[in-house]
A protein has these predicted regions:
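An intracellular "coupling" helix at the cytosolic face of ABC transporter transmembrane type-1 domains
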Residues: 24-31, 119-120, 136-145, 149, ...
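Transmembrane helix-loop-helix hairpins at lipid-water interfaces of multipass membrane proteins
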Residues: 32-87, 167-172, 283-287, 410
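Hydrophobic alpha-helical transmembrane segments of ABC transporter permease domains
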Residues: 39, 43, 47-51, 67, ...
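Cytosolic ends of transmembrane helices, especially the final helix of ABC transmembrane type-1 domains
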Residues: 228, 252, 296-327
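ABC-family ATPase nucleotide-binding domain "signature/switch" substructure
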Residues: 389, 425, 430, 438-441, ...
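Helix-to-loop junction immediately C-terminal to a conserved catalytic motif
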Residues: 395
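Conserved "ABC signature" C-loop
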Residues: 431-476
Length: 556
């Protein structure tokens, strides 16, 4: 049984080599801040060692062991102190200003990667967990790449410089002080493995807490109507208890490890102090020399202690990198220029079958249907019959296990791919408005839409009420369209779809909250354009009456 098995340390999901390659790619996007931090750190090392020499020289001049001007010595010390202040100010500026830019850049890259990846039909991570990773783990990785690595270079430089300085004063003690360090390096491998496991547990528990908080706030109205306030608070307490237990366990392990480490360094410092005192008693070391002696020992032990403290930092960044790499596991969708087709367009399903990864049977099996150009089709079926799955297949969000989805017009036909999504506009069921003004929401359909185009889309979607609001298009919607009724939010969503103006329109229960008269007027407006191919997922007879054909899906 090896050490990993003895201490029940699990095999990590990714090897250290794979994680280092991922971190290297991430570092290349943050080189400027890393290089500046490293340069400032190395200059700080030079200033710090120069201060040791300046203090020794000033004390020896004051005690008469060395000739020179005490005013000149103090002046040099003051200059070095000012240099240290200036370097610290530069370090703070680089860390704060460039640091937030680096973090923003990585968050943007990760979000872009998530949005361009294939969707498997079911999310593998809770949205609260994803947010936790994009906020906390990205911050950990950026801090490591732009601060920890440059600081490590400075620490190593300080260690080497202080050792050489001490070696020039006393060779034996220099080797004694440095000789105990490999012992801690050998112990660090076991420490890192155990701490990595504990840190991963803490981060996962932290994600669970954020997920509970997010869901509770998101569904606050439902929770109040179900009178489940105490249930959700108890659920939060349960996840927090798990987090607290794991934090206590990790902290206890860290405290014991740090105690052993600090005890070793304290013994080393006492040995150095005793050695220097004996040399002073023999008059082979001046008081200034002893001061420099002890300062150098601190400057050797300090970097050595900092290097050992890097172990939990490495653990944290390895854990954060693993969690971010998991977000990149889904393959990217096909990338390239959009492929628009001239309207009117149709969609033809040829022997389509689809089953989700965790499903025992096909949701859709051997389906053939033609949504011909300019048609209006109602898709009907009981819950679980595959209506929403069909929409996802038509939008190329999912890919059929068997068969083909063909997009065609009078001139050409092509097998559907994500690059053809530009030919569709989709209005999902429920409230799909986002935080911001009504104008912001509408321009998600067409970024450069003019005021006239927006007003026309609102009229077509029976949403002219927007212009009668006190702030009109600049009325602010809170999260999920807060401040508007369900019917108002649906009509604004339809107006957004009309602004997008694509040849094929898909509506998933998009008129469910509308009264019959408004629904009739809206359907009449939508179907007045004969170049559009319209597909309704619906249960409402009033919608079916407006359609040219129907598709009945049967539950498999």
């Amino acid at each position: 049984m090896n050490i990993r098995q003895w201490f029940k340390i699990p095999t990590p999901k990714y090897s250290a080599k794979v994680i280092f390659k991922w971190l290297w790619r991430a570092w290349r996007g943050n080189q400027l801040q890393a290089i500046l931090n490293a340069a400032i750190g190395l200059l700080s090392v030079v200033v710090s060692l120069a201060q040791v020499w300046a203090v020794q020289h000033a004390i020896d001049v004051a005690s008469g062991h060395t000739e020179g001007s005490i005013y000149w010595s103090v002046g040099v010390m003051a200059l070095l102190v000012l240099c240290g202040f200036a370097l610290r100010i530069c370090s703070i500026w680089v860390r704060n200003i460039l640091g937030i830019k680096a973090q923003n850049r990585m968050q943007q890259r990760m979000l872009d990667r998530i949005l361009r990846s294939e969707w498997t039909g079911k999310e593998s991570h809770h949205s609260g967990d994803v947010l936790n990773r994009l906020e906390q783990d990205v911050g950990t990785v950026v801090s490591f790449l732009t601060e920890t690595i440059p600081n490590t270079i400075s620490v190593v430089a300080m260690f080497v410089g202080a050792f050489l300085y001490l070696f020039s004063m006393d060779k034996v003690l220099a080797f004694v002080i440095v000789g105990i360090i490999p012992v801690f390096v050998l112990l660090s491998k076991l420490y890192i493995g155990q701490m990595r496991r504990l840190t991963r547990q803490v981060r996962d528990s932290d994600s669970k807490v954020q997920s509970v908080l997010q869901e509770t706030i998101q569904h606050r109205m439902l929770i109040k109507t179900l009178e489940s306030d105490s249930v959700m608070v108890d659920r939060l307490e349960s996840t927090q208890s798990e987090l607290r237990h794991r934090v206590v366990k990790r902290t206890a392990f860290s405290v014991v490890s740090n105690f052993i480490l600090n005890a070793g360094f304290s013994v080393g410092y006492l040995i150095a102090f005793l050695w220097a005192a004996l040399r002073m008693a023999d008059q082979t070391l001046t008081f200034g020399g002893m001061t420099a002696f002890l300062q150098l020992v601190n400057r050797i032990q300090g970097p050595a202690r900092d290097l050992t403290r890097l172990a939990p930092v490495f653990v944290g960044v390895f854990t954060a990198a693993e969690r971010l790499m998991e977000l990149e596991e889904n393959p990217l969708e096909e990338q390239g220029d959009p492929i628009p087709l001239t309207a009117p367009c149709g969609v033809r399903l040829e022997h389509i079958s689809y089953a989700y990864d965790d499903g025992d049977s096909n949701v859709i099996e051997q389906l053939n249907f033609d949504f011909y150009p300019g048609s209006c089709t109602a898709v009907l079926g009981e819950t679980g019959a595959g209506k929403t799955t069909l929409i996802r297949l038509i939008l190329a969000l999912l890919h059929p296990n068997d068969g083909k989805v063909i997009l065609y017009n009078q001139q050409e036909q092509k097998e559907l791919s994500p690059l053809m999504r530009c030919n569709f506009v989709y209005v999902p069921q429920g409230n799909t408005l986002m935080s911001g003004t009504i104008r912001d929401n509408l321009r998600l359909g067409k970024l450069n839409a003019t005021e006239e185009e927006i007003k026309t889309a609102l009229e077509m979607s029976c949403a002219s009420f927007v212009m009668e609001l006190p702030d009109g298009l600049d009325t602010v919607c809170t999260e999920a369209g807060g401040g508007l009724s369900e019917g108002q939010a649906q009509r604004i969503s339809i107006a957004r779809a009309l602004l997008r103006n694509r040849p094929i329109m898909l509506f998933d229960e998009a008129t469910s909250a509308l009264d019959p008269e408004t629904e009739r007027q809206l359907l009449h407006n939508i179907l007045s354009n004969h170049d559009k191919t319209v597909i309704f997922i619906t249960h409402k007879p009033a919608v079916v009456d407006y359609c040219d054909q129907t598709l009945h899906l049967q539950k498999q």
